[in-house]
């Protein structure tokens, strides 16, 4: 039976929409000629997305939650927050803009609509002119960037019933970006009541009165052993008992005494007693468990001119909330007397000596945490932050534009440096740079490239300068599937930290927009059916704004074991047919209780799910990234001996049971590495931070002790390591050892196996799995010890790993890379790894022992490699420049030039070519340039369109789409770009293949003034003719004129549809905030031939738009046969071919010294 939870949320969403429908026109502002509420747009001007607002604000992406139905079109803000998540729209939007799906304003449609930034947008059919119905609208909101205080609240009650006291009032910080507001959130004021009598209850007491109290956790669990005190009586006056209760005689019932409680491992709590009768008062004190601080906002890098001001901001959370901060400059602690100890660091009148790295540390009772470093760049007078001369950026030209007989030809189109510029007037006392500017394109120049039979237009960067930055939004998409069966996890709840942000789809898909200033993206997926363990993941993302795709594998819960609460039981950890159990979980009798502390007696269903590191495949289902906060507040890695999740419930109940104390026994034979038996500890995962916390560390009981078999009265003669833990909430436990021998491994991804620097690919997720030491070393019988992931940027990725300097093969690793659903291939190592191919200099390559997965067996996949993690040795020049870097040289690893040693991956899909007249780096959305010929007209929303072409023929064929302006006056007939794709064979039909060809979507161009239906011409590059066109697609094109000329039977031409048609038409459209993710998802649907599926296996007969019949050209007779049949003709052909070869050779020699604007292939 399906869980009712998803149905409940769908009902809530329906109520949101119903609430919008019930709204009347008189409730809110009504507009018949405006699509923007809060600031009316000028229809003759560009969209407000490109205007400079006086307020520090930005537009959200577009939303469309409703389609025109019986009553009209309703885009309520409540429904948008439900479907897209509350983080997608700020609490108080400044403005709202609405447009139809054809990008028309309501005024242009002549429709009466209602818009309010606080409620949303709606259009009612009954209010429209006769014969008209509401169009399908989508909306976006304008949200403030800068944090600001709200209005003060009302004054509270006086703290004293007599005499002198004080009262408080509070205000809240309103910020959509998570920034903090300067100043205090509360204000105090003195208040005077009537004079107190001479003898007060505080001094005289009430002998016949009694105070009854209890000490509990926020969930209601009683706490025993808490020390209780009164503010007027120093020292401990009582201690809470077994059920968390205590009694204090002599406290007057009406005194409203302030009672405090303290307990090891918990923050202090205070509460006020209230009279329960004439002589009895009661109080409940809530103690929160101490939580180490963690950063929710890190200081950000800034650029300033000498003499300007700058503000760095740091914000930490924890239990209790950290209030003490320390600031460091280049590792040196700044004077607190001058800079203070708050979360803001303000520097005024900057000079060159203040440039460098800044970081903060936050403290509370549980520990400390260190932020990442922010770089402050101070420009000298006259120094430019943005070089007006563009950097080199090579793009590959089509094959028929290259030199005869040469390799691929590249053209330098220029690229502006990815740097920040100082604001026009510096920075005030606020966290964010509201008017931040970046180095961007100021001017483009048009060039013409002569190719074989045609001229190729291109626009190159001519000048760079400082302009307003485009908003950068990290985006993570992916899919959650079962680790054992691959079935999607449908409607799983998604938590960002502890806050719910949405659900997975029916196919298990999800999309998460990374909040600003996020360092670690911690996401939890909760299965509504309860069949899977909660999956807590730290998802790598690209802070530059490129989208990243992840596949999450959820671990199915183990079968239930029935126990008796009064007898307890033992459950093995990791027992399989191939390997004995690593240990066991011992649940003592009489220790089970309800979450509120009530003892539980009766049967218990226990599910203990173990992630066994002896199984290499289990790494993909492991939670978190195995990190913890060390004593210095820095992230440090752990090495696992296994993870386990415990689920204890009464049969048929949904309430989870707790255990006051459980023991974990680990077989000592599995812990062989020196020092690990002493360092092994029990850890639990905090789902809010994704960090592991040592169990019992505050009492010093988190480690293991050694017990012999005799002491444990066991039959087998074995030694065990015994540790203890308390089971509460829904936590994952871990058997780990901290590891200090750490390094970074440099990895780059390329578009092809030529490994050209200009073809580096960003957004690739590189995963490194630390394996056990080689045979001959003191190793544990396990397959992996930890894992780590990183996302490639413009300069590759640096992945953390364990390493050893003395023994090269003491640590080994297995490395893979993936982009979306595609696995990349590693550089080959057969028959012998060479430096030129692998990318690592000798003799370091020999010491690393690089081997691709198919090194010993060519039949295996090529998607990974193994290596020895040999730490570079001092004094060895070949090891000083990668690919392995010591832990303290992370900056050297990140900034290493492409000529330094690194490991390489390349995309398998090499039979694909893309050309844009206005160059755009899809992995760096900030490189977008506003131009009418831009392939992507909107930098905040990328729409990818694909056409599925079926080809009947004996081989695979290249298919080209030529995309030019169709209906727009300024671009009609002008080229947008080219796309070449090789068809993929149907796995079961050798005579059929299909190609998913990208074309430029129809819609608004950069100026947002007029729609253009792109003229798309699809041509297979072979002897092919068009034999069929999808009937629905032909019907649609006929009903939406004008029609494109279709005279050429060897091609298919159309004016791109404005609607997202779907698989029934053979057209696949996906809109996303990342161009790469939009294309990856659209290609997966195109391969599958469905509008909601995803496949990497081509289904050539499903969901096609047009079909071509191709045939092989007649084979040319051999030279011997031609000489026999027609000697004179054959000799003439040979002379002509030799003459052409001679001319090509002379041309190459002439152009060898001067290549003009063309760069050589690399």
Swiss-Prot record:
Molecular function, one GO term: carbohydrate binding
User: Where is this chain glycosylated?
Assistant: 330
Q: Which domain of life is it from?
A: Eukaryota
A Gene Ontology cellular component where this protein is annotated is: extracellular region
Cite the residue spans of the region called Disordered. 23-51
Q: How is it modified after translation?
A: May be cleaved into 2 chains possibly by a furin-like protease upon or preceding secretion. N-glycosylated.
The family database entries (SUPFAM superfamilies) matched by this protein are listed as: Immunoglobulin, Starch-binding domain-like, TSP-1 type 1 repeat
Q: In which tissues is it expressed?
A: Expressed in articulated and meniscal cartilage (at protein level). Also detected in heart, skeletal muscle and brain. Not detected in growth plate cartilage.
Keyword Signal on this protein? yes
Signal peptide location in the record?
A: 1-20
* Residue intervals of the Ig-like C2-type domain: 293-377
Cell compartments where the protein resides: Secreted, Extracellular space, Extracellular matrix
**Does this entry carry the keyword S-adenosyl-L-methionine?**
no
Give UniProt keywords alphabetically: Cleavage on pair of basic residues, Disulfide bond, Extracellular matrix, Glycoprotein, Immunoglobulin domain, Secreted, Signal
What region holds the TSP type-1 domain? 146-197
Disulphides: 158-191, 162-196, 173-181, 314-360
Q: Quote the function comment for this protein.
A: May play a role in cartilage scaffolding.
User: Under what name is this protein listed?
Assistant: Cartilage intermediate layer protein 2
Encoding gene (name): Cilp2
């Amino acid at each position: 039976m399906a869980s009712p939870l998803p149905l409940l949320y769908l009902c809530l969403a329906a109520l949101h929409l119903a609430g919008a429908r019930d709204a009347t026109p008189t409730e809110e502002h009504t507009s018949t000629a405006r699509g923007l509420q809060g600031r009316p747009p000028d229809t003759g001007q560009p969209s407000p997305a490109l205007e400079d607002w006086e307020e520090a604000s930005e537009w959200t992406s577009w939303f469309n939650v409703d389609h025109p139905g019986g009553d009209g079109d309703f885009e309520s803000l409540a429904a948008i927050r439900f479907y897209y998540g509350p983080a997608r729209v700020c609490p108080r939007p400044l403005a709202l803009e609405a447009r139809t799906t054809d990008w028309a304003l309501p005024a242009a449609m002549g429709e009466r609509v209602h818009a309010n930034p606080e409620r949303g947008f709606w259009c009612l059919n009954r209010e429209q002119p006769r014969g008209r119905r509401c169009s399908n609208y989508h909306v976006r909101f304008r949200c403030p960037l800068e944090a600001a205080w709200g209005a003060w609240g009302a004054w509270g009650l006086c703290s004293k019933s007599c005499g002198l006291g004080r009262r408080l009032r509070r205000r809240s910080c309103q910020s959509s970006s998570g920034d903090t507001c300067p100043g205090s959130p509360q204000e105090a004021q003195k208040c005077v009541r009537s004079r107190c009598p001479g003898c007060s209850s505080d001094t005289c007491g009430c002998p016949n009165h009694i105070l009854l109290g209890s000490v509990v956790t926020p969930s209601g669990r009683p706490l025993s052993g808490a020390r209780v005190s009164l503010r007027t009586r120093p020292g401990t006056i009582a201690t809470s008992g077994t059920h968390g209760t205590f009694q204090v005689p002599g406290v007057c019932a009406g005194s409203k005494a302030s009672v405090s409680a303290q307990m090891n491992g918990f923050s202090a709590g205070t509460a006020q007693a209230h009279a329960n009768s004439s002589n009895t008062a009661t109080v409940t004190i809530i103690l929160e468990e101490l939580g180490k601080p963690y950063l929710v906002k890190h200081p950000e890098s800034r650029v300033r001119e000498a003499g300007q001001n700058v503000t760095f901001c740091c914000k930490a959370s924890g239990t209790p909330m950290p209030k003490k901060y320390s600031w460091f400059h280049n590792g040196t602690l700044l004077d607190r007397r001058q800079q203070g100890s708050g979360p803001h660091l303000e520097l005024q009148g900057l000079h060159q000596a203040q440039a460098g790295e800044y970081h903060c540390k936050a403290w509370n009772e549980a520990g400390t945490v260190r932020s990442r470093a922010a770089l402050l760049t101070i420009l000298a007078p006259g120094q430019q932050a943005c070089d007006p001369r563009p950097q080199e950026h090579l793009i590959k030209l089509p094959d028929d534009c290259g030199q005869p007989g040469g390799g691929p030809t590249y053209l330098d189109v220029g690229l502006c440096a990815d740097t920040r510029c100082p604001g026009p007037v510096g920075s005030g006392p606020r966290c964010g740079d509201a008017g931040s500017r970046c180095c961007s394109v100021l001017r483009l120049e048009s060039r013409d490239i002569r190719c074989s039979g045609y001229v190729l237009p291109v626009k190159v960067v001519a000048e760079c300068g400082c302009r307003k930055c485009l908003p950068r939004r990290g985006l993570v998409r992916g899919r959650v599937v079962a680790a054992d069966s691959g079935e999607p996890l449908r409607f799983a709840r998604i938590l960002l930290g502890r806050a719910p942000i949405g659900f997975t789809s029916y196919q298990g898909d999800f999309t998460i927009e990374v909040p600003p200033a996020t360092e670690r993206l911690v996401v939890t997926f909760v299965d509504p059916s309860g069949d899977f363990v909660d999956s807590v993941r730290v998802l790598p993302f690209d802070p530059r704004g490129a989208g990243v795709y992840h596949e999450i594998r959820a671990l199915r819960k183990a079968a239930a074991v029935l126990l008796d609460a009064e007898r307890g039981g033992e459950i093995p950890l990791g027992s399989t047919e191939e390997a004995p159990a690593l240990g066991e979980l011992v649940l003592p009798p009489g220790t089970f209780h309800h979450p509120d502390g009530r003892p539980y007696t009766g049967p218990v269903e226990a599910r203990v799910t173990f992630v066994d590191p002896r199984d290499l495949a289990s790494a993909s289902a492991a939670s978190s990234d195995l990190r913890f906060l060390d004593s210095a507040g820095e992230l440090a890695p752990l090495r696992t001996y296994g993870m386990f999740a415990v689920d204890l419930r009464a049969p048929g109940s949904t309430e989870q049971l707790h255990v006051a104390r459980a023991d974990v026994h680990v077989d000592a034979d599995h812990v062989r590495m020196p020092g690990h038996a002493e360092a092994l500890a029990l850890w639990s995962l905090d789902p809010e931070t994704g960090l592991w916390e040592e169990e019992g560390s505050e009492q010093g009981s988190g480690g293991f002790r050694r017990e012999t078999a005799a002491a444990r009265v066991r039959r087998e003669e074995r030694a065990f390591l015994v540790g203890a833990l308390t089971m509460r909430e829904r936590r994952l436990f871990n058997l780990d050892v901290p590891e200090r021998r750490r390094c970074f491994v440099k990895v780059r991804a390329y578009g092809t196996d030529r490994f050209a620097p200009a073809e580096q690919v960003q957004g690739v997720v590189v995963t490194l799995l630390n394996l056990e030491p080689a045979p001959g070393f003191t190793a544990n019988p396990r397959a992996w010890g930890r894992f780590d992931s990183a996302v490639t940027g413009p300069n590759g990725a640096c992945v953390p790993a364990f390493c050893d300097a003395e023994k090269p093969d003491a640590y080994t690793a297995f490395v893979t890379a993936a982009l979306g659903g595609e696995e990349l291939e590693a550089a080959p190592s057969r028959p012998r790894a060479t430096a030129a191919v692998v990318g690592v200099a000798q003799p370091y390559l020999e010491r690393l022992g690089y081997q691709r997965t198919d090194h010993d067996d060519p039949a295996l996949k090529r998607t990974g490699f193994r290596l020895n993690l040999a730490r570079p040795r001092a004094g060895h020049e070949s090891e000083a420049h990668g690919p392995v870097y010591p832990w303290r040289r992370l900056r050297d690893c990140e900034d290493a030039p492409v000529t330094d040693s690194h490991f390489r991956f390349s995309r398998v899909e090499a039979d694909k070519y893309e050309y844009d007249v206005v160059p755009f780096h899809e992995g760096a959305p900030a490189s977008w340039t506003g131009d009418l010929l831009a392939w992507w007209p909107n930098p905040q929303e990328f729409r990818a369109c694909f056409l599925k072409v079926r080809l009947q023929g004996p081989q695979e064929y290249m298919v080209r789409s030529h995309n030019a302006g169709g209906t727009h006056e300024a671009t009609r007939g002008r080229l947008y770009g080219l796309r070449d794709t090789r068809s993929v064979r149907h796995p079961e039909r050798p005579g059929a293949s299909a190609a998913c060809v990208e074309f430029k979507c129809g819609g608004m161009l950069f100026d947002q003034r007029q729609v253009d239906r792109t003229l798309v011409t699809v041509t297979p590059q072979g002897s092919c003719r068009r034999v069929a066109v999808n009937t629905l697609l032909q019907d649609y094109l006929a009903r939406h004129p004008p029609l494109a000329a279709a005279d050429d039977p060897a091609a298919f031409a159309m004016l791109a549809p404005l609607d997202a048609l779907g698989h029934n038409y053979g057209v696949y459209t996906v809109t996303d905030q990342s161009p790469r993710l939009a294309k990856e998802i659209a290609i997966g649907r195109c391969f599958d031939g469905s509008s909601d599926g995803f496949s990497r296996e081509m289904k050539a007969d499903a969901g096609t738009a047009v079909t071509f019949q191709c045939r092989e050209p007649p084979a040319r007779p051999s030279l011997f046969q031609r000489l026999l049949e027609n000697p004179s003709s054959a000799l003439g052909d040979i002379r002509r071919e030799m003459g052409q070869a001679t001319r090509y050779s002379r041309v190459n020699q002439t152009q060898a010294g001067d290549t003009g604007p063309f760069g050589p292939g690399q």
